Design a protein with these regions (language model features):
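N-terminal secretory signal peptides and thylakoid transit peptides that target proteins
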Residues: 1-18
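Serine-esterase "nucleophile elbow" of acetyl-processing enzymes
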Residues: 28-94, 112-114
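Short amphipathic alpha-helices and their capping/turn segments at secondary-structure boundaries
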Residues: 33-41, 102-115, 145-154
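Structural recognition of the beta-strand scaffold that forms the well-ordered cores
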Residues: 43-44, 90-94, 117-121, 159-162, ...
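A structural motif corresponding to the C-terminal end of an alpha-helix
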Residues: 80-86, 148-158, 190-205
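Oxyanion-hole/transition-state-stabilizing segment in secreted/luminal serine hydrolases
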Residues: 100-141, 165
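Substrate-gating cap/lid alpha-helix
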Residues: 168-206
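Histidine-centered active-site loop/cap adjacent to the catalytic His
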Residues: 186-192, 200-203, 218-242
Length: 242
């Protein structure tokens, strides 16, 4: 090869490096644009409290409403969403039926850029499956797993919703077939664990107390949020998210 001239292979190599540089620069520009324009991403993790679109006829879940309210369905919440305050997007990762052991899978291939916050609801299915009559280390094991997951998340703050009570505190509405006294004790233990963890990474959202003020129209299939319930979950998270 003569001095001062590039071979075809050398030219292709340099072109490839230039292309890679352009891609890297593009990613950097996108990240800076997201920060400069104030784009915020809301991440949802957890169970059907956040992944409840299949339980209402409009396919609505709380994360959608927090990012952009449906003004036709819920005119009272017009202007009360992240999109009204700037650029916002949703990354919905919560999965109906999830327990605490399923949370790490929801964060697989997670890539966080720019401003971001996370909301989590978990514990209800853990109670239904194992913890409602637990008299051993079950709640402590749940707490350790939840703390490990939240600690591993690359975004802050993280807002954790506690577990609501579809019986509205009325033992005559017991649908579990378990001594209500023991069930309520363990429900309280799970919520106490969630509260303790939430303080470390953001704050707790008290779904339990909020839903005690509601009525059966907030639920469907006994324990799932209805369309109204999805909006009420949104209502509970809204002050923290905004």
């Amino acid at each position: 090869m003569q001095a001062g001239r590039l071979s075809r292979r050398g030219f292709i190599g340099l072109a490839g490096l230039a292309a890679l540089g352009a891609v890297a620069a593009g990613v950097g520009v996108l990240s800076r644009q997201r920060e400069e324009t104030g784009l915020i991403t809301l991440y949802t993790f957890g169970d059907s409290i956040l992944d409840c679109a299949d339980y209402n006829e409009r396919g609505v879940h709380p994360g959608q409403l927090l990012v952009r309210n449906d003004d036709g369905l819920f005119p009272d919440f017009r202007g009360q969403d992240l999109s009204s305050r700037g650029l916002a997007r949703l990354e919905h990762r919560a999965v109906d039926g999830a327990t605490v052991t399923g949370l790490p899978a929801q964060a697989r291939d997670l890539r966080v850029e720019g401003r971001s916050i996370a909301i989590i609801t978990v514990g209800g299915n853990d109670l239904l499956q194992d913890l409602v009559d637990d008299e051993g280390p079950g709640v402590a094991t749940f707490a350790q797993a939840l703390d490990s997951f939240v600690r591993s998340l690359p975004m802050r703050p993280v807002f954790l919703g506690n577990v609501y009570d579809p019986s509205f505190g009325d033992d005559t509405n017991n649908f579990l077939g378990v001594d209500p006294k023991l069930a309520r004790k363990n429900h309280g233990r799970v919520n106490a664990a969630i509260a303790e963890i939430a303080i470390r990474y953001g704050a707790m959202v008290d779904l339990h107390q909020h839903f005690l003020k509601g009525d059966p129209s907030w639920f469907t299939y006994t324990i799932e949020p209805s369309l109204i319930g999805a909006s009420e979950v949104r209502r509970a998270f809204l002050p923290s998210v905004l």
